[in-house]
Amino acid sequence: MNMKVDLCGVTLNNPVMTASGTFGAGEEYSEFVDLNRLGAVVTKGVANVPWEGNPTPRVAEVYGGMLNAIGLQNPGIDLFIERDIPFLKKYDTRIVVNVCGHTTSEYIEVVDRLADQPVDLLEINISCPNVKEGGIAFGQNPKAAEEITRAVKKYAKQPVIMKLSPNVTSISEMAKAVEAGGADAISLINTLTGMKIDINRKTFALANKTGGVSGPAIHPIAVRMVYEAANAVNVPIIGMGGIETAEDAIEMLLVGASAVSVGTANFYN
């Protein structure tokens, strides 16, 4: 069966991708998963310099999923280019680099460094709820989202996917904003902001107090938002949020997604 998908001019062997932050750069999972079977590997967020992330504890189990506040810990663009890209190039899968930053200039620096690298697509993360600056600050304001999309597009040599947050009043307006800024595709949803209390310690389960909720509990919300975004814009949509089964993925495709990303399910035994 031919399951190839054209995503912004890039051919994927199938529409199944990993979700950023749940698969590293693929090496950790390569002993358990044949990366050649994936449509694309979406890397963990990559910044201009190494980020330490948030203090621990930063992961907690919740009903129907998990709560995390990793804070986009990553080794930085230098090590990513030196180590991770050569590893991924050994496989017959597309490479999607998730880019994170605190400021527009930091995003641009990473995008510019990747311009001459053999990667296929860029996913710009303006939707992480677990960093104090950047990310979600762009992802909740349509004007800011449009402006950073336009700024990144000036430097990008690969197609640009803008990753949207569900923590907004209107996902349709956010989708329209990044499309107006020149986005080649849109991915959604990132995690929903949540909180858990450790009743035995009488304190927050996470050091960051709040974190991002992911897993099957958010799937119906994700399906609804993918549907709304797909009906608001004319660029391809990548659907994610609580996808565990083929049926979950098909739901996303039926409401307008061109491809899907699997995230929290990667953490299951």
Residue spans for each PLM region:
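N-terminal capping/small domains of soluble enzymes
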Residues: 1-95, 101
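Acidic-and-aromatic substrate-binding clefts and catalytic sites of carbohydrate-active enzymes
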Residues: 24-25, 105, 268
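Alpha/beta enzyme core
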Residues: 31, 102-238, 247-257, 262
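Short beta->alpha connector loops at strand-helix junctions that form conserved
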Residues: 44, 241, 263-264
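Short gly/pro/ser/thr-enriched loop/turn and capping motifs at secondary-structure boundaries
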Residues: 47-52, 129-131, 193-196, 267-269
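Small/polar glycine-rich anion-binding or flexible loop at a beta-alpha turn
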Residues: 243-247, 269
